[in-house]
Structures are given as C-alpha cells and as structure tokens.
A protein has these predicted regions:
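A glycine- and small/hydrophobic-rich beta-loop-beta segment
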Residues: 291-332
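Glycine/charged-rich beta-loop-alpha catalytic/anionic-binding loops adjacent to active sites
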Residues: 66-73, 169-173, 243-247, 253, ...
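Alpha-helical metal-binding/catalytic segments enriched in His/Glu/Asp
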Residues: 191, 245-247, 261-304
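Short acidic, glycine/serine/threonine-rich loops at helix termini
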Residues: 112-116, 186, 212-216, 257-265, ...
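A glycine- and small-aliphatic-rich helix-loop capping segment at beta-alpha/alpha-beta transitions
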Residues: 116-122, 221-224, 262-271, 313-320
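Gly/Ser/Thr-rich helix-start
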Residues: 220-224, 250-252, 256-259, 277, ...
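Active-site pocket-shaping loop/turn-to-helix segments
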Residues: 77-82, 270, 274, 329-332
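Short amphipathic alpha-helical segment within the helicase RecA-like ATPase core
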Residues: 1-251
Length: 332
C-alpha cells in the first residue's frame, strides 16, 4: 500500500472528488457549508440526526463516486490523538483499491501546531504493510490532495515527519523479517549500510569481542553457526563535545532459550526478541535523516541463542566485560 501526499496551490471552494473535512466534537457543520453543495449540505445534516456522533469520524456516501468524511476533533486534542485520527481515517478509506481524496485544511479548528502534519503522519504510519514474501501481493494506492489556506507545511516539518516515518518503517521491517533471513550476520551487514545516512558505524565481531572480554554476550551466541556482534551507531549533530544521549537495544535474532529450552508453543514469536535493537536502529536513522542537532549513540548486541554441541550449558561460568564472573543457571 502506498500513500501519496500532494499539496495543492489552487483552492477550489467546492470539489467533486472524495472530501475530508474537520468538525468539532459536536459535529457542528458550519465549517462544511462553504465546501459542499447545498444539496450535499442538507443531505449530511439530515443523516446526522440519526448518526452516532460519539464516533471520531463519519462517512457519507454522496454517490458511487464521491464520499464526504467528517473528522471530529476536540479543540484541546493531543498530538497522539491527532495521529490516531489519521490512522482511523486510513482504516476507513483503505479498500485495497486506488482512491483519491482531498483534505480541506480550512476546516481545522484545533490550536495544535501543525495539526495537519500529525494527522497525515498517523495516516501514513497506519499504511505500513510487510508483504515482502507474499506470493500474491495486493497493491493499492491512496492519493491525498491537501487543499486550503492552511495547507502550507514548512520544509523542516515535512522533513521531520518523513524522518519519523522512515525510521519507524525501518524498525518494523527489521522486526518483521523471519529468523532465517535476519540472523546476526545479515543484521550487522544491514546496519553497516546506514553509513550512507551519515551515521558512524562500528561493528565488533567475535574476534574483537573476545579480545575485549565480552564473554557474557559471546556465551549467548556460542551455540549458533552465525557470528555474534556488538554494533555502535553514532550521530554527531550538535557540532560540539556535549555528552551524547545513549540508547541500548537487545538484539537476540532468535531465542530458543538454549538448553533451557522454551516451550514449542509460540516459539516462532522469538524472532521478535530483537525488537529492542530495531527500535534503537530506527531511532538513530530518524535522527540522522532529520539532521537532529544532538549527539547520540545507539548500542545493540546481536546474537542468536541456539541449541548445539557448542552451546552454553546451565551451570557454565563466564567472565563479563566488567571483570565479574557469572554463573549461568538458566540459558534462557
């Protein structure tokens, strides 16, 4: 599913295409009057008498080719609520086919800065789908034409939301990959490719980790035929020596539990044991894309906890990077 956003300079008073307008929580239709025909206005007001106005949005079928959607937003609405409204709209208009809608920004009543940006951001986040391995892919396309005097969005805000979307989608892609594809070797390779975004990437493989004395991390992955890695991801956007924000994420690409084996039921979900690391990676990519004026570092450990003749045993003792010894009573 793709969503395309177009900002239109021409502002038609009334449009023949599918239309999205904003109203208050009481579904006061005053703001609607200047943007639809008299017939459409009367039709909607008649239907509103029997509608559930507690809903966040209402869809009115004007004809087989036109819908008018009223989106209800409180004046004191929060940014996250606005994004949820955008997500709800996407669910309403996504029918798996090509669709074209106009959003009239002149009807926005909220005082929230960049209401439109948050609304469209929520819509785009909801549009995510991971169908990389589907034999038969369902393809559809939604076009949103932004019209009205309030349709202007600064270059920074567009970049900000674009960066957030790219970072979030990258995280979701990593989490959605199956364990036989995104093992530690492949994961490390993908992280190395983030250098093109201006991030500094350092990859510590088995040999370097052993030299550093990171035996606790190595112990988790020693039963796998794949390597174990520690990856640091740096973004220096503050142009000074200020201390960086630090983010650490767990990247167990698949966790069987080792010899302390997990139950078979739902073990397939253990491919998600690397989600923490994926969040850190997506965050760092987002910071780089928006040219954030901060210093930040992300650290992720990438391992695969498997059962084999070389796997760590319950009762093994390892020495950690800090120099402390650890008795492993449970390999999970």
């Amino acid at each position: 599913m793709t969503v395309q956003i177009n900002y239109k300079s021409n502002i038609p008073k009334k449009t023949a295409t599918n239309l999205i307008v904003f109203v208050d929580e009481k579904y006061n239709t005053k703001s609607l009057k200047n943007h639809v025909s008299n017939q459409e206005y009367s039709y909607i007001n008649d239907l509103l008498k029997t509608c559930d106005v507690k809903k966040n949005l209402l869809v009115f079928e004007i004809s087989s080719k036109k819908k008018i959607i009223l989106v209800s937003a409180k004046k004191d609405v929060q940014e996250s609520d606005i994004e949820n409204l955008g997500a709800e709209l996407y669910t309403s208009i996504n029918n798996g086919k090509k669709a074209n809608f106009s959003v009239n920004t002149d009807t926005i009543i909220s005082k929230i800065d960049n209401f439109l940006g948050h609304f469209l951001h929520g819509l785009k986040l909801k549009s995510y789908i991971f169908n990389k391995y589907k034999t038969k892919k369902v393809t559809s396309h939604i076009t949103i034409n932004v019209i009205g005097k309030k349709n202007k969005s600064t270059t920074y805000n567009k970049l900000k939301f674009k960066a957030l979307e790219e970072g979030t989608f990258y995280t979701r892609d990593l989490v959605s990959e199956p364990g036989n594809v995104l093992h530690p070797d492949e994961y490390a390779k993908r992280l190395n490719s983030l250098k093109k975004n201006g991030l500094k990437i350092n990859i510590y493989d088995d040999k370097k980790l052993k030299k550093l004395g990171m035996n606790a991390l190595l112990g988790v992955g020693q039963g796998s035929i794949r390597g174990s890695y520690l990856v640091t991801i740096e973004w220096n956007g503050a142009n000074n020596n200020s201390k960086p924000l630090a983010f650490v994420g767990k990247g167990v690409c698949f966790d069987t539990g080792g010899y302390s084996l997990k139950p078979a039921k739902f073990m397939e979900d253990m491919t998600y044991d690397m989600a923490g690391s994926a969040v850190v990676v997506g965050l760092m990519k987002s910071l780089a894309m928006r040219k954030a004026k901060i210093n930040a570092v992300g650290v992720v450990g990438l391992v695969e906890n498997m059962v084999s003749g070389n796997a760590q045993r319950p009762g093994d003792i390892v020495k950690s990077f800090s120099g402390k010894t650890i008795e492993v009573l449970n390999t999970d």
